[in-house]
Swiss-Prot record:
Transcription is among the record's keywords: no
Coiled-coil ranges (or none): none
Residues annotated as signal peptide: 1-24
GO CC annotation, single: extracellular region
Similarity annotation: Belongs to the non-disulfide-bridged peptide (NDBP) superfamily. Long chain multifunctional peptide (group 2) family.
Top-level division of the source organism's lineage: Eukaryota
Tissue expression per record: Expressed by the venom gland.
Organism: Tityus costatus (Brazilian scorpion)
Keyword annotations: Antibiotic, Antimicrobial, Secreted, Signal
Name by which UniProt lists this protein: Anionic peptide clone 10
Amino acid sequence: MVSKSLIVLLLVSVLVSTFFTTEAYPASYDGDFDALDDLDDLDLDDLLDLEPADLVLLDMWANMLDSQDFEDFE
């Protein structure tokens, strides 16, 4: 019971932080692919300032690049 509540709480927190990230950075969700180029310029301070939703998006993007499905779109 506790583990289900914890999982639901974590999912809700990720969704809420993603919502606030889209409000704070609307250009990153409007097809602005220059944001991907900015990832090359990140240093340690930038990584420490990332929000949890940003880390989830970076992880999803890295997994997409590693997957075989991504190569089909090139």
